[in-house]
Regions:
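A conserved structural/catalytic subdomain of Rossmann-like adenosyl-cofactor enzymes
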Residues: 1-169
Length: 169
């Protein structure tokens, strides 16, 4: 009546249809899904695929589900052939799990209705927005650089034309 289970799963079970969707529907409708944690790829020997931890609970006090993206570089250490979860990484993930706080790009608690509206999809990426790591470009600065480069090219073309004229002269 007060049990909790943590199950290591491959990501596909969290979004595929068919029997897997029916199982997710049962777990969500009965308020058993406490947390879904996505981990970095290449953590387990023999597979480079990323895995998730599905935490089920029989004693939840609300109908929200927590989603945690622990796949970023802050949550593992790169070693020769594998990625490794250190004690520090595990403590950080557990702290996020325990507090159930929303952390931008890392953790978010989602209401039951939102999961139902999303066809019982339990993929972390559906609810936790990935951090935008693209370079921010100042368009005005870029236009200045292009203008300078074009001017240099024009100057070089003029110099080349003058050299060719002297050679052919």
């Amino acid at each position: 009546s007060k049990g909790r289970a943590a199950i290591v799963c491959f990501p596909g079970i969290f979004y595929r249809g068919g029997a897997e969707q029916k199982i997710r529907k049962y777990l969500v409708d009965n308020n058993f899904v406490e947390t879904v944690i996505s981990l970095a790829p290449n953590l387990f020997f023999g597979t480079s695929i990323a895995v998730n931890i599905l935490v089920l609970s029989k004693h939840k006090t609300d109908n929200k589900t927590q989603f945690v993206d622990a796949s970023g570089a802050d949550f593992y250490k790169k070693e020769t052939n594998n990625n490794v979860l250190t004690e520090k990484h595990i403590e950080e993930i557990m702290k996020i799990f325990d507090t159930k706080e929303d952390i931008p790009h890392v953790a978010k608690c989602i209401e039951y209705e939102a999961i139902v509206d999303n066809d019982y999809n339990l993929s972390v990426s559906s609810y936790v927005e990935a951090k935008d790591t693209r370079e921010i470009i100042d368009i005005n600065e870029l236009n200045k650089e292009i203008k300078t480069t074009v001017a240099k090219i024009d100057k070089l073309r003029t110099e080349i034309d003058e050299i060719i004229e002297v050679i052919e002269g």
